């Protein structure tokens, strides 16, 4: 006769199953398991006296005959497409199966064969997500990479050459020489990388040159002059080469207003950075652009979410980042024009509605590279507390909201920049860039970060201890972050033109180089779970924001979860 087990004991042994609920960190966000792909009574688990042993859960299947390299057992997957319990099989650095692991000689329905060549990672009691993708990186210092991967981010796109004055302000790697050096530097960093060329030019020749040198996108920044002519020229180049254009528009409205920028874009695909405007853009109404079908709107994390400290910290931050002088009244006025409580408050709600589709960092240039995922789910928490249950959710769970917010830092930036054929989700065929979280530390401190199917970062105790767990326990780089294992565990994203020109061979790059693709002709409709297109209007006197005629406003948070409770300093 079958053995019956109560839900609590089952969850403690094999992780939560269908209908079980889990709180994320110390937030008010609750997920509920929608489906369990494992088989009751036939689950696999590693350990002494447990299932994955020779002749039991482990069969005789060789790697060549189909056994996986690694199995993650009983993981609770949170992704844009669902919240499910499953075993996950990894092979050749990629996700090869999501389903039921085990020994096909003794079990039915096995989709992930475990053999003598299979490693096991215990996913029970853990949440599994895709590695985060941050598409707004100022490459000011290489130490950002360690901070990013420690937070669960495994792909970084942006621009820069180090702590140059231009890089401190703008996400551009200008010119073929600098693009080449940054591509070579990427070989020594344990994440996926791609670099934006400078897009500010009124004629295309210098932009063509940068794309052929390997730039995976182009960045228009107001500090270099984001004029209608530059916008039109840059987008023309992008359309010819299939790369994305990112834009930081004209705060001072010197060359035109938001209407002029929209006209210059001419309905072409464009990724608008910090679309609310505190990070830069037409004052006070750049936020309007999130209602355009061809616009892929993102936020940077200093305004995520709106709190009692947001306005105060932004002024000094802005003065430093954009090389302004507090003794010059015009510089101070420029800074003050960008910081508006009304538009920042509206940004919270526009994210909750799915009108803003992406969240990124703006690393060391009005943003924090290690807080993208944290601030995303702080925003989700704040919106649940202030706005209540989202349409599609209920009193039991926040699954709709969670799938909306996880998409903002995984699949949507991947789609926007033509990376989604490689990364951005927990789906078969994708690079195995995966993050395991203890639920109590979700979004704050990952337990394990895999890059290309190998462990690159993990919480680890005293290296001289007799077991891995004695303190001090903190995140540390693992073997996939060292030596010859690093490069094959990562990808470098280039333009197809750069690959055709032989850039990887000419530079002697060791990291596999892949093209960005399908960046043109996409729009809000392609953003997963974030496709809202409200008509947004801004009162020019009060800065109040209206969406489809409804005032968007909320109070600043006085306290947030996922914050000081998790950090000693």
Swiss-Prot record:
Name the UniProt record assigns to this protein = Urease subunit alpha
Name the domain of life this protein comes from. Answer: Bacteria
Q: Which cofactor does it need?
A: Ni cation
Q: Which GO terms describe its biological process?
A: urea catabolic process
Q: What family does the entry list?
A: Belongs to the metallo-dependent hydrolases superfamily. Urease alpha subunit family.
In which pathway does this enzyme or protein participate? Nitrogen metabolism; urea degradation; CO(2) and NH(3) from urea (urease route): step 1/1
UniProt main location, coarse = cytoplasm
- Cofactor: how bound: Binds 2 nickel ions per subunit.
Supply the InterPro entries for this chain.
Amidohydro-rel (IPR006680), Metal-dep_hydrolase_composite (IPR011059), Metal_Hydrolase (IPR032466), Urease_alpha_N_dom (IPR011612), Urease_alpha_subunit (IPR050112), Urease_AS (IPR017950), Urease_asu (IPR005848), Urease_asu_c (IPR017951)
HAMAP family, A to Z: Urease_alpha
Q: Where does this protein reside within or beyond the cell?
A: Cytoplasm
Q: Which gene encodes it?
A: ureC
**Subunit and interaction comment:** Heterotrimer of UreA (gamma), UreB (beta) and UreC (alpha) subunits. Three heterotrimers associate to form the active enzyme.
One of this protein's Pfam families, by short name?
Urease_alpha
Occurrences of domain Urease (ranges): 131-569
* Organism, as annotated: Synechococcus sp. (strain RCC307)
- At what positions is N6-carboxylysine found? 219
Q: Name one GO molecular function term.
A: urease activity
Which residues of the sequence carry a binding annotation for Ni(2+) 1?
A: 136, 138, 219, 362
**Record: residues binding Ni(2+) 2:** 219, 248, 274
Q: What PROSITE patterns does the record tag this protein with?
A: UREASE_1, UREASE_2, UREASE_3
User: Where along the chain is the active site annotated?
Assistant: 322
| Reactions listed under catalytic activity | urea + 2 H2O + H(+) = hydrogencarbonate + 2 NH4(+)
Q: Which UniProt keywords are given for this protein, alphabetically ordered?
A: Cytoplasm, Hydrolase, Metal-binding, Nickel
After translation, how is this protein modified?
Carboxylation allows a single lysine to coordinate two nickel ions.
